[in-house]
Amino acid sequence: MPLKLVPSKPEEVPLMVETYFEAFSQDPIHQRFAPRGTQSARDFWTTSLSAEIRDENNHFLSVWDDSSTPETFVGFAKWIVPGASPEALPPADQWPSEGDQQFSVFFFGRLGEMHHEAMGKRPHWYLELVAVKPQYQGKGAASLMLKYGVNKADEDKVECFLDASPAGQPIYERYGFRVVQRDTFLDGTYVQCAMVRDARV
C-alpha cells in the first residue's frame, strides 16, 4: 500500500480531529475524557491542535494513502523536540465539559509525572500522540511516523520517550523502546506504560 509521510499542515486539523476520534473510539480512557460525538470534545481537540501545530517545537506528521483518488488521510503524529516542554495541562474547567474533567486532570497529570520520573531533564524526542484510522492500522502508517522520530533522535544522539497502552507496546518494542514504568487506571482495568528508547551513541 503506497503510504506517504509529509509534514502536517494547519488546514489538516479537521482531518486530524476526526482521525483521533476514529482511532480511539474503543479506548476507555479517551472516551472518558473526550467522548466521541460530543461538541465539547471536538472543540477541545480543534483548538488544541490548531495552536500546537504552529509551534516549531512540535513536529506534526501526516500519512496519506495516495493510491486513492483523491488521496486519503490515514493518520498523524506529534513529536516534541529535545529541550522543549509539552504544553501545560489546562485547568479542569477547560477540558471537554461532556467528559470527566476531574479524571482528565488526574490522568494526564499522572502521565506528566511518569514522563518526568523517567526522563528528568535529559534531552529526548517525545512522541506525545499518534493516531491512525482503524482500517489502516497494522499497515505501516505508525511505523513511518515512528521511524521519523527515532531517526531524528539517532541524529541528535539522544533518547526517545512515549507513553502507551499495552496494545501499543509491541510495535514500540520493535523500534527499541522498553517499558520503564507502569501505572493502572479505571480500577486497575487500564494499564499505561512509560517507554524509553536509549540513545544511539
Model-assigned labels for residue ranges:
Residues 70-137, 186-190:
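Conserved acyl-donor/pantetheine-binding loop and adjacent beta-alpha core of acyl/acetyltransferases
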Residues 132, 138-151:
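Conserved acetyl-CoA-binding loop-helix of GNAT-fold acetyltransferases
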Residues 43-62, 84, 122-126, 190:
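A short helix-loop-beta-strand connector motif used in the catalytic cores of GNAT acetyltransferases and
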Residues 123-126, 152-164:
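Conserved GNAT acetyl-CoA-binding A-motif
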Residues 143, 155-157, 166-183, 188:
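Conserved active-site alpha-helix within GNAT-family acetyltransferase domains
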